[in-house]
């Protein structure tokens, strides 16, 4: 059965009213059990793809600062968890809740470009900007604690700390700009595919429902 949204006074008498959570669960049941993966691949795999991109970017940024500050094996887990794992998890959750949920529950209820832009903003913020801000702080902290690199005191010489941060960050600025552009474009493309495939899935469900209704209608008899 295809889902549809309507006002209470517009509901047919035999309509089954369900909550948004129930509707979302029903939609996911259809998507995961759909026999043609090519028709629903973006809905299934986009959160995982975006999560992997965020994890890869976080690992790249974290490794850059760790290498510059000669950390070696010091604090490896303590930096990878917040800079690699957390962005990956938050990126997936943000996409599922703020992007996929509106697409599945209210198709055509919002401007497609607006959804794509919002999705790209979440991806670049959580997957690139957040690790870029956190990674140098974590690396500086462990470098000071483990004595792997001489870090000026941030309270006594904040300007020197800033210059050191700029020195280490400048080499990866072009790469970060490229990553932001590529991830934004890929995220917008995948989100557009989600919107398109969900709409086609809804039309297909209505078509199947119409066929079933026709098959169960009593045969017309002409005299």
UniProtKB/Swiss-Prot annotation:
Associates with mitochondrial complex I assembly intermediates during its biogenesis. This is Transmembrane protein 126. The chain crosses the membrane at residues 40-62, 79-99, 124-144, 172-192. It is a multi-pass membrane protein. Belongs to the TMEM126 family. It comes from Drosophila melanogaster (Fruit fly). GO terms for cellular component: mitochondrial membrane; mitochondrion. It is found in: Mitochondrion membrane. As part of the MCIA complex, involved in the assembly of the mitochondrial complex I. Residues 63-78, 145-171 are mitochondrial intermembrane. Its main location: mitochondrion.
């Amino acid at each position: 059965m295809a889902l549809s949204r309507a006002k209470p006074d517009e509901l047919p008498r035999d309509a089954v009213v369900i909550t948004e959570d129930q509707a979302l669960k029903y939609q996911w049941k259809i998507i995961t059990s759909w026999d043609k993966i090519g028709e629903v691949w973006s809905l299934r795999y986009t959160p995982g793809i975006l999560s992997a991109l965020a994890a890869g970017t976080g690992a790249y940024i974290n490794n850059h600062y760790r290498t510059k500050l000669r950390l070696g094996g010091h604090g490896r887990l303590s930096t990878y968890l917040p800079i690699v794992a957390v962005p990956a998890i938050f990126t997936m959750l943000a996409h599922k809740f703020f992007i996929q949920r509106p697409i599945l529950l209210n198709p055509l209820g919002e401007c497609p470009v607006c959804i794509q832009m919002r999705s790209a903003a979440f991806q670049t913020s959580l997957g690139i900007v957040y690790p870029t801000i956190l990674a140098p702080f974590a690396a500086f902290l462990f470098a000071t604690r483990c004595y792997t690199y001489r870090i000026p005191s941030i309270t006594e010489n904040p300007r020197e700390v800033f210059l050191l941060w700029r020195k280490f960050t400048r080499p990866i600025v072009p790469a970060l700009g490229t990553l932001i552009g590529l991830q934004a474009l890929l995220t917008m493309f995948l989100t557009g595919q989600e919107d398109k495939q969900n709409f086609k899935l809804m039309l297909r469900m209505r078509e199947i429902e119409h066929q079933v209704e026709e098959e169960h209608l009593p045969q017309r008899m002409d005299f």
